[in-house]
Amino acid sequence: MINIRSAKQMDLDRVEMIYNNIHDEEENGMATIGWNRDIYPVRKTAEAALERNDLFVMEDEKRIVAVAIINQIQVPEYADAAWKHEAKEDEVMVFHTLVVDPFEKKKGYGNAFVSFYEEYAKQHNCKELRMDTNVINQRARKMYHNLGYQEVDIVPCVFNGIPDVQFVCLEKCLS
């Protein structure tokens, strides 16, 4: 049975393992995401999110299989995006750093996490959903498109110290 909950301190080792697994997959040519093992996402990414209370984990049969950050923090790169919908900051919920353990892929966990994110946004009275991915991450782009997210812009940037990122900004309006 799938359960999504706020992460706890005791979850950090498993979250770090999932981050390492996705980095291994990319380094072995099994995925194209655009992240960097030494820069992002790393354990400190999860620790900072845990401290803000916006780190969420997905469990299946009590085993953590995916992790994401959900909050109202719009990264600075969003200021350069041509968003289609106007929204006040407190009306926007942002989905960051979704990672499904590569050993658990193709089970619908990504879709289920996005569904949770949308419900979470509604519960917090947010009408605008925003997220991003790297232009090279075709798997994520396809999934988000299939879930009704519109790519509104591609912003070139240095993201979290990773150079030459083409930042795809996506949005979906709930109202």
Located regions from the model:
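Conserved beta-hairpin
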Residues: 54-68
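Conserved acyl-donor/pantetheine-binding loop and adjacent beta-alpha core of acyl/acetyltransferases
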Residues: 69-97, 102-105, 158-163
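A short beta-loop-alpha structural element at the N-terminal edge
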Residues: 3-17
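Conserved GNAT-fold acetyl-CoA-binding loop/helix
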Residues: 3, 24-45
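A short helix-loop-beta-strand connector motif used in the catalytic cores of GNAT acetyltransferases and
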Residues: 44-57, 73-77, 94
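Conserved acetyl-CoA-binding loop-helix of GNAT-fold acetyltransferases
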Residues: 100, 106-119, 142, 146
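C-terminal "cap" of GNAT-fold acetyltransferases
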Residues: 87-89, 127, 134-137, 146-147, ...
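Conserved GNAT acetyl-CoA-binding A-motif
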Residues: 114, 121-132
